[in-house]
Amino acid sequence: GLFVRSYSIVPVVRVLYFLFALTMILKTLITFRFCHETKQGKIRRAETRGISVFHMLGEYRQLIPGMLKNRGVLKAVAVSVILYVTNMVSTNFFGLYVTQRLGLSENFLALFPILNAAVMLIFMIGLQHRINATKFRIPLWIGLALYVVAALVLIFSPADRLGFVLLYVFIAAMAAALVNPRKDVLLQLNITSQERARLNALIMASTVALSSPFGYLAGWLSSMDRRLPFVFTLLLFVTAMFVIGRIQEPQVEER
């Protein structure tokens, strides 16, 4: 926000893109230098040596029916889609809501992601290891309940009151620290290690495809009332709580 006011948005965005490109190059170099192929990856490379890419793509036809028959995977995908949609709505419409309806200055928009990241970091470092001893579903329920509370705080926030928006960001960050790691674990516990890479690719593609129509729906709701997209996310969080309630407590094998 400070740089935009001083130099305008175009040069600032150019610098951001340059920094992003630089960090991705560094990440790629570090990955190739210090990371190694997994055991299953080595097995898969040996199995597919000499096989064409088109033949390997055709093998997905055998994976899709198996994925659709696995209720655990379908429930995990449902939770993943719901959280993907709610994150998409929050990312795209939060700025519009707090500036156009709540009347906050655009200069505050840069503050909220910093606060969100700081709260998540403190929560994960200070409290996450203590929560890991509890049952798997309970932290997920608590996180989703916090998301519901955060949505209610934002929906009923009075205009020109920064404190309510900061409270929303704080609660949502705690919820994300509880939900996001366990959402990913939930997917991994329901797929076999032999097909993990291909199933993860299918699940990611399915998540993006299934969530795409909801972006249009959220935009339509926002055009009627800036609060409606967040009412929609509230309903999705309640739905996710119901889905989690239908999932059997995962059993993690100790080694």
Question: Residue spans of the language-model regions?
Answer:
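Transmembrane alpha-helices of Major Facilitator/SLC transporters
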Residues: 109-131
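Juxtamembrane intracellular "pre-TM" segments in multi-pass secondary transporters
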Residues: 36-77
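Transmembrane alpha-helix termini and helix-breaking/packing motifs in multi-pass membrane transporters
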Residues: 1-14, 211-229
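Short amphipathic helix-loop junctions that connect adjacent transmembrane helices
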Residues: 92-109
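Structural signature of the two symmetry-related core transmembrane helices
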Residues: 138-153
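Intracellular juxtamembrane helix-capping segments at the cytosolic ends
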Residues: 178-191
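Helix-loop junctions on the cytosolic side of multi-pass membrane transporters
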Residues: 28-47, 245-255
